[in-house]
């Protein structure tokens, strides 16, 4: 099995926000035992969804849960800067295109209980790949192996991929950057994701300037507590 290592700078970064993600992890646990497969998305790129996905997966693994992090943002993956491989790796797109077995793409990491599926090479037809039978087949094969599966998806405000992925998930979380995305765009993204049939679990308000007292513009979405204030 291929091994990935989280670079030291990313581990240090995650340590700084450990308390916040532990709170989010606890809220997910309280949301219901059935919420095990979670899609993480945002309205636009650069809002911090990939860092959120990674930090949440780390928190779950460090709490003793066998966790799989899937990089499904195959159009614009940024996780190659977070995880370094010790050899040649295959990823999600290799599996979805029929060019790899499931066991070939699940990688161990230097964090106990955390495994990762890298995105793989950028495909010419990412949406079509996600719609083929392989994606649901993969979820069916792994859902009883892991305690939690965290899937980093493309931004729902740009492409429909996140909704396709969410259809196979128990719930989804929206990550949005404070002061960047207008409320109506966040609401539209939530509605688009809900059309997948997946359960809306909340919004994580990211990159918050803590000197500002309130963030009422985003309304009451049942988000994961007022302490979920993080950086990308």
Curated annotation (Swiss-Prot):
Its EC number is 2.7.10.2. Belongs to the CpsD/CapB family. Involved in the regulation of capsular polysaccharide biosynthesis. Autophosphorylation of CpsD attenuates its activity and reduces the level of encapsulation. May be part of a complex that directs the coordinated polymerization and export to the cell surface of the capsular polysaccharide. This is Tyrosine-protein kinase CpsD. It is an enzyme of class 2 (transferase). It comes from Streptococcus agalactiae serotype III (strain NEM316). Keywords: ATP-binding, Capsule biogenesis/degradation, Exopolysaccharide synthesis, Kinase, Nucleotide-binding, Phosphoprotein, Transferase, Tyrosine-protein kinase. GO terms for biological process: capsule polysaccharide biosynthetic process. It catalyses: L-tyrosyl-[protein] + ATP = O-phospho-L-tyrosyl-[protein] + ADP + H(+). The gene is cpsD.
């Amino acid at each position: 099995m291929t091994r990935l290592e989280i670079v030291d700078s990313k581990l240090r970064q995650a340590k700084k926000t450990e308390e916040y993600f532990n709170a989010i992890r606890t809220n997910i646990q309280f949301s219901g035992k059935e919420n095990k497969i979670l899609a993480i998305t945002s309205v636009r790129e650069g809002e911090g969804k990939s860092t959120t996905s990674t930090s949440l997966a780390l928190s779950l693994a460090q709490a003793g849960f066998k966790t799989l992090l899937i990089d499904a943002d195959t159009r614009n993956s940024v996780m190659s800067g977070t995880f370094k491989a010790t050899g040649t790796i295959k990823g999600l797109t290799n599996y979805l295109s029929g060019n790899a077995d499931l066991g070939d793409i699940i990688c161990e990491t230097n964090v106990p209980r955390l495994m990762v599926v890298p995105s793989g090479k950028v495909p010419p037809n990412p949406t079509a790949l996600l719609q083929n039978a392989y994606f649901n087949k993969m979820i069916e094969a792994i859902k009883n192996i892991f305690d939690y599966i965290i899937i980093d998806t493309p931004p729902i405000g740009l492409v429909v991929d996140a909704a396709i992925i969410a259809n196979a998930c128990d719930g989804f979380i929206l990550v949005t950057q404070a002061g960047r995305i207008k409320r109506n765009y966040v609401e539209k993204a939530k509605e688009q994701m809900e059309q997948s049939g997946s359960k809306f679990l909340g919004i994580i308000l990211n990159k918050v300037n803590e000197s500002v007292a309130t963030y009422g513009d985003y309304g009451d979405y049942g988000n994961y507590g007022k302490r979920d204030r993080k950086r990308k």
